[in-house]
């Protein structure tokens, strides 16, 4: 039997109305299992009780990403994400007191090398080579105290899965899952890595990120096109920066820059942690207070100052490349928080 468009639309509309109570019930059921808890230091927890499999998933949201970078340190938000897996003063080291002194020597050697490299009149090749050797030797001494991958191996041995992180323009995300009886282990590890992160093997990891850029951007036509497109779309706002950073910045920023980024943006009032799985909120809140209450409160991240000027004409990017043709089209839209 043939139905008119109006009758079909009416039937669909009635079906949607009939489904509304079910949707409302599902939402009410979800909200009944959700607990929001805020610590005195500003850190907010969202706890979703989902009985069933004895597994709990954890998601840490940090309200800072590549948009919080400034010229000269692009890629630093992503770089710190890598550093957050390197351990603490207690995890990832065989002798932290000695390692800390060795890292200070690495910093001093790097800055001496960097100053010579940047001389406006040109570097002395022989002196630069000697300074680079000294920097390399200092890194080798610091590396001798490192217990590699200890943070992730603790999680693996405890049955953890999905350990990972990602950095976007507006936020950085950390996540993994553990058996439900390992919640206290998670609370210790997660609070410890944001209470006392150690930027060990910084320059070695910086080399890893530089190689990541070569693979994802420099050697990929789509990567090169997207980078140019974003730069054209945002001529003033840091959304125009590549999240992975410009190569010249990756070659130049220092361990102290990463520490400063952490100090500025990783205060607990700039973070939200979601916990979902076989948990009871009232049972774990004291645990959260005990471990995460150690994080000192700090000021909120500085707001972005730069406002993107109004676009008054179409912007076109053409990128000649010996590859298959690629086409991309983008439109500016209001922020997700816009009323």
Where are these regions (language model features)?
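N-terminal secretory signal peptides that target proteins for export/translocation
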Residues: 1-4
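Bacterial N-terminal signal peptides
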Residues: 9-19
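Non-catalytic beta-strand/loop surface segments
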Residues: 23-68, 92-181, 215-270, 281, ...
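Active-site recognition of the HExxH zinc-binding catalytic motif
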Residues: 74-82, 86
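M16/insulysin-pitrilysin zinc metalloprotease superfamily fold
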Residues: 87-89, 176-205
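Short amphipathic alpha-helices in soluble, non-transmembrane regions
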Residues: 188-192, 286-291
């Amino acid at each position: 039997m043939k139905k008119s468009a109006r009758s079909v639309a009416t039937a669909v509309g009635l079906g949607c109305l009939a489904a509304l109570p079910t949707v409302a019930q599902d939402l009410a059921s979800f909200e009944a299992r959700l607990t929001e808890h805020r610590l005195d230091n500003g850190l907010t927890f969202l706890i979703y009780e989902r009985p069933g499999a004895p597994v709990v998933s954890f998601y840490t949201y940090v309200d800072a990403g590549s948009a919080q970078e400034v010229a000269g340190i692009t890629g630093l938000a992503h770089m710190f994400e890598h550093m957050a897996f390197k351990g603490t003063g207690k995890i990832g080291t065989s002798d932290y007191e000695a390692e800390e002194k060795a890292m200070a020597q690495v910093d001093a050697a790097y800055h001496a090398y960097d100053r010579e490299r940047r001389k406006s009149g040109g570097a002395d090749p022989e002196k630069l080579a000697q300074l680079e050797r000294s920097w390399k030797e200092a890194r080798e001494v610091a590396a001798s105290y490192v217990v590699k991958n200890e943070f992730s191996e603790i999680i693996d041995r405890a049955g953890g899965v999905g350990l990972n992180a990602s950095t976007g323009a507006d936020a950085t995300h950390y996540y993994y899952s553990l058996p439900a009886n390992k919640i206290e282990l998670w609370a210790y590890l997660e609070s410890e890595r944001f209470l006392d992160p150690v930027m060990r093997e910084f320059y070695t990891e910086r080399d890893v990120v530089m190689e990541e850029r070569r693979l994802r951007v420099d050697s990929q036509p789509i990567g090169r096109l997207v980078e140019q497109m974003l730069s054209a779309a945002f001529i003033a706002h840091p959304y125009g920066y590549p999240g992975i950073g410009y190569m010249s910045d990756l070659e130049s920023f220092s361990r102290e820059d990463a520490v400063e980024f952490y100090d500025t943006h990783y205060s607990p009032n700039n973070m939200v942690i979601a916990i979902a799985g076989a948990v009871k909120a009232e049972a774990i809140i004291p645990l959260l207070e005990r471990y995460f209450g150690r994080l000192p409160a700090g000021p909120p991240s500085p707001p972005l100052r730069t406002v993107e000027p109004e676009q008054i004409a179409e912007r076109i990017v053409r990128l000649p490349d010996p590859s298959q043709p690629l086409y991309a089209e983008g439109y500016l839209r209001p922020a997700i928080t816009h009323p």
